[in-house]
From Swiss-Prot:
Involved in the degradation of phospho-AI-2, thereby terminating induction of the lsr operon and closing the AI-2 signaling cycle. Catalyzes the conversion of (4S)-4-hydroxy-5-phosphonooxypentane-2,3-dione (P-DPD) to 3-hydroxy-5-phosphonooxypentane-2,4-dione (P-HPD). HAMAP family: LsrG. It comes from the Bacteria. This is (4S)-4-hydroxy-5-phosphonooxypentane-2,3-dione isomerase. Keywords: Cytoplasm, Isomerase. GO terms for molecular function: (4S)-4-hydroxy-5-phosphonooxypentane-2,3-dione isomerase activity; oxidoreductase activity. The gene is lsrG.
């Protein structure tokens, strides 16, 4: 299992727009054959910080995900909403 935790920091006045943009990516991602989880989380103490917990069957499924229209559109639309680049940490899932 291939797991990625993505941290996204959003401009304060762009939070609602971020949620709408990411909703389309979420809905598309959970329908992908290789997707196991795609959770969108909001930091309890920093309301402009979001985490995306993505679990895929393997790296090939991740590669396919990164070619999907919902992913490509999301990445394009996120750029003006963020305060800086996304931060990614990759894990090997052992016990889901």
């Amino acid at each position: 299992m291939h797991v990625t935790l993505v941290e996204i920091n959003v401009k304060e006045d762009k939070v609602d727009q971020f949620i709408e943009v990411f909703r389309a990516n979420h809905l598309g991602s959970i329908r992908e054959a290789g997707n196991l989880r795609f959770d969108v989380l909001r930091d309890e103490h920093i309301p402009t910080r979001f985490y995306i917990y993505e679990a895929y069957t393997d790296e090939a499924a991740v590669a396919i995900h990164k070619t999907t229209p919902h992913y490509l559109q999301c990445v394009e639309q996120l750029a003006p909403l963020m305060t800086g680049p996304r931060k990614k940490t990759v894990f090997i899932g052992l016990m889901p």
